[in-house]
Amino acid sequence: MANNLLTPTAVTREALRIAHEKLSFIGTTERQYDDSFAQSGAKIGDSLSIRLPNKYTVRTGKTLQAQDTEETSVTLTVATQKGVDMNFSTKDLTTDIDDFSKRIIEPAMAVLCSNIESTMLDSVTKDIYNHVGTPGTLPTFAQINKAKAKLNQYLAPKDNNRHIQMESIDMAGQVDALKGLFQDSKEISKQYRDGVVGRTAGLNWVENERIYTHTNGSDITGITFDSVTAADGDSTLAITGASSAPSVGSIFTMADVYAVHPETKVAYPHLQQFVVTAATTSSLSF
């Protein structure tokens, strides 16, 4: 009887199936296919422009106040490629897909997915400027609700796509802290059977051991901004009093600079948070 060899397509599909199960964070992100990459002839290359929502102002009264439409975008760059390269024999390809998956594909995809998740979490976490709670301590249920409030304040959609990622130790603490509160019977069963919080406070709770841990620079006090040279629209400011450069990903505020509602422009009662994207001892970008 002729050998029934596993094809590259079968191996790839199995690898993707396993990857989908192991990508705790990436699995919650937008993965809509963009056919710009499928164009024949002129390709878009490694960069994809993502259009941002247009912003307008509201007039009061009957007089027309026409305004220009200025579309803005951000660029998504395919900058990092990762893979697990391995050798296997034609004999391996004659095995059943389940056996081949367990022996070869699954271990390879496990380490690849873990590396991809860690890289992505490190990257995106350093770009996030909204923060609640006390660093280094288990967030309380009230603080988690404050995080949800931050999403509301910046107009994040109120749907089932809101997720919270926690390491197992923190998840265990949350399960213990929430065990006495009212829960939907289906969700509370997950705490006792699986040791994880299901869907609570409008969030889907997910365990993830690759959470990025941020470390501030050695000098985080006494840094002041040069307000004399600052101008509207600046994303880099001169600083003084820094003995070492602030760490990329550190969050800071500026006196009298308040957060505002994105649409009404009415100021919130709290200061706007910013995140360091680049820094030296004399300047800081955000």
Enumerate the predicted regions with their spans.
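Short, well-ordered loop/turn elements at secondary-structure boundaries
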Residues: I44-G45, K158-N160, S247-V248, H270
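N-terminal "assembly arms/tails" that initiate or stabilize quaternary assembly
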Residues: M1-V74
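Threonine/glycine-rich low-complexity segments that form extended coil/beta-edge repetitive scaffolds
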Residues: A66-T72, L76-V78, S235, F252
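Long, contiguous amphipathic alpha-helices that act as assembly "spine/axial" helices in icosahedral shell
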Residues: I50, L76-Q143, N152-D170, Y192-E207
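Autoprocessing Asn-cyclization modules and mimics
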Residues: G173-F286
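Short alpha-helical segments and helix-capping/turn motifs at coil-helix boundaries
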Residues: E30-F37, Q143-L151
